[in-house]
Amino acid sequence: MLTDTLIQEFQDRNLISQITNEIDLKNILLHNKISLYCGFDITADSLHVGHILPLLCLRRFQNLGHRPVILMGGGTSLIGDPSFKLLERQLNSIELVHTWKQKITKQLSLFLKFNVGKNNALIVDNYEWFKNINVLTFLRDIGKHFSINQMIVRDAIQRRIKRLDQGISFTEFSYNLLQAYDFYFLNKQLDVILQIGGSDQWGNIISGIDLIRRLHKKRAYGITVPLLTKKDGRKFGKTELDTIWLDKMKTSPYKFYQYWMNISDSDIYSFLKMFTFLSLSEIKALKDTTKPTELNSVKKILAEYLTNLVHGSNEVRAIQRITSSLFSGKFSEMKETDFFQLEQDGMPSVQLYNSGNLQQLLVYSRLALSRSHAKSMIVSNSVRINNIIQNNPFYILCNRDKMYHKYTLLSRGKKNFCLLCWTK
């Protein structure tokens, strides 16, 4: 892939939702190595799968000699981005945000290279420049360039204003100015000319481009990647129960792997283009030679690729052992050492100290959202204990459910498992 075809490559991989001044940007990339950035607000102690796509976009640029800059929103995380948020975010302390930042920094090295010379990836924190800004100076020098008329008609703001139960605070409303200033600051200090973000960031990116034009008389550019959602409207990276994190202590490698195995059949080839570095010709060959009934083999390629990227090859091999055991259906043939291996390999598990109510255990093991949800699954024959359907909603697990006096395999449907480990 040559530099002059980078934007075309992005388009062929469905990686561009919107782009500014496409012809100019293509010409710049043809003749120059640039610095570009993507911002991440620090709202938790781990990245999640929704962050993978923009990070891989930065990596594609870095592979061609461009310098990626990661902006950690240590400052803006204290405010909260209202973009496509229905409710105002809880504000976190400076100390907590700093602790989270340290954990996230380690995860970034999974995607970007920090020791390759001229185009080393760089991490910056906007708290470092916002902490010393005088509010009067900011409003006079920066605020005067923003039109309330333009800001208030943006979709994200309108959605919040129209909610009778939840408006928008000035704190969140001002976020647009802060992100625009980020782009201006990075352009001035590091010659960053391109910002990448999710499609929900388009308005903020345009504000930054306008601010650079007004204050620097220079051109800057923006690309947004698609904001992926599932068929039910849920944001990509979330299941019906929780978020899929990159931290193995928050989401087990097995659960991470299964998330990709469970994507819609209609998404698989698009996701291979977007989330892997397989060539487009390789992906086309897969599509041309794979029967509709064999799509799980293609999902396996995607799941193993991303699990290896985030968790490493050892975890992939461990997951292969788990899936081989679980989906063979031959639980009666499993040895005690096999169950122990499942526990060690990262299969979701919970400790059980005495007999347990099935509804309660389904909730505790995160196989159900609530006891009422658990009850409906049980009576609809969706719950199995050691691969045997249990449709009594008041069932109490007891000694006869133990295998080797210690293990019970609880499942919801065909793909969701939890290992109950009884303690003596």
Curated annotation (Swiss-Prot):
Residue span of motif 'KMSKS' region: 235-239
EC number of the protein: 6.1.1.1
Residues binding L-tyrosine: 37, 175, 179
Keyword rRNA-binding in annotation: no
InterPro entries: aa-tRNA-synth_Ic, Rossmann-like_a/b/a_fold, S4_RNA-bd, S4_RNA-bd_sf, SYY-like_C, Tyr-tRNA-ligase, Tyr-tRNA-ligase_bac-type, Tyr-tRNA-ligase_bac_1
Domain S4 RNA-binding stretches: 356-414
Binding site residues for ATP: 238
Compartment(s) of residence: Cytoplasm
Substrates-to-products reaction catalysed: tRNA(Tyr) + L-tyrosine + ATP = L-tyrosyl-tRNA(Tyr) + AMP + diphosphate + H(+)
GO-annotated biological processes: tyrosyl-tRNA aminoacylation
GO CC annotation terms, alphabetical: cytosol
Keyword Protein transport set for record: no
A Pfam entry, by short name: SYY_C-terminal
Chain positions of motif 'HIGH' region: 42-51
Keyword entries, A-Z: Aminoacyl-tRNA synthetase, ATP-binding, Cytoplasm, Ligase, Nucleotide-binding, Protein biosynthesis, RNA-binding
Single GO term (MF): ATP binding
Subunit record text: Homodimer.
Family of this protein: Belongs to the class-I aminoacyl-tRNA synthetase family. TyrS type 1 subfamily.
General function of this protein: Catalyzes the attachment of tyrosine to tRNA(Tyr) in a two-step reaction: tyrosine is first activated by ATP to form Tyr-AMP and then transferred to the acceptor end of tRNA(Tyr).
HAMAP family (UniProt xref): Tyr_tRNA_synth_type1
Record-linked NCBIfam families: tyrS
Official protein name in the record: Tyrosine--tRNA ligase
